[in-house]
């Protein structure tokens, strides 16, 4: 019965109340009263809808609402149990992730590798530890992430040692952590990206927060310096330098900023911001759900092949559905032709048969 306008939008509540503990008693009372009034207004509108129905129909709808309430209770229990199950298995994954970290970064050696390496590695070649460029190649093999990684980013991402994620509760959401070895690009050893969700069970993003990267002088990958020669005859003979923002994977740590509630933005700007936030969330959730749990499969390219195969199968299913639709249309056309013959003869040959229905078939 709802057209979507009756839903309670609390997306601005986090921005409006950054820290509820700092609110005075009066402010808290006003906030509670405001929410209560909003809910009462929604309830009144729903009551109006019910009262506009015929008594018998209204009774049926009331029973449907009771059924929906039972469903919502079960759904809440499902979300609760699912969260507990995810937390349980997340702890079971941790030892496996730790072993992966140690192998990738050369902390431990795999049985049998030492002797094989001594036999196969040329004496003049330096033996590499672990799996070089593991995370860089794992991410590059994913279609979404490969579009974000620029060629100039790759040297810095070779220092990426590990990626972890954690679920957070206050506020709800999740946090990504990128661990880097000492490198010539930035000072940070860990870069983080935190997603605050309005509802953890629904992917409704409130805002995202990234680490401020401490770039070393002249090493910032999110900006480029343009040098322009001065005009002829100019007294200033030095090149003119201009700094511009540029595409980089590391822009991921400077997410789109959601404006304050009292800041007005036009429709086009709002749509652009929404698209940017959706894209940003896609990148974060891809790293969380695909790259971290299946990193070696993305490193080898197996996971990418699996996704390509699934995409082909989906396309074939769509083609089959289209073929079925075409066959149904052909059958309908044949039936119409048969009906026309019964009424007064065959459809005239010529223009009417080239994918078009004849204008009219009159009886003689």
UniProtKB/Swiss-Prot annotation:
One of its GO terms (cellular component) is nucleus. Residues 32-86 form a coiled coil. Highly expressed in tissues exhibiting active cell-division activities, such as root and shoot meristems and young flowers. The modification Cysteine methyl ester is found at residue 361. A motif (Nuclear localization signal) lies at residues 227-232. It is found in: Nucleus; Cytoplasm. Residues 259-269, 304-340 have a biased composition (Acidic residues). Pfam families: NAP (PF00956). GO terms for molecular function: histone binding. It comes from the Eukaryota. Residues 250-269, 301-364 are annotated as: Disordered. GO terms for biological process: double-strand break repair via homologous recombination; nucleosome assembly. Keywords: Chaperone, Coiled coil, Cytoplasm, Lipoprotein, Methylation, Nucleus, Prenylation. Belongs to the nucleosome assembly protein (NAP) family. May modulate chromatin structure by regulation of nucleosome assembly/disassembly. Binds preferentially histone H1 in vitro. This is Nucleosome assembly protein 1;2. It comes from Oryza sativa subsp. indica.
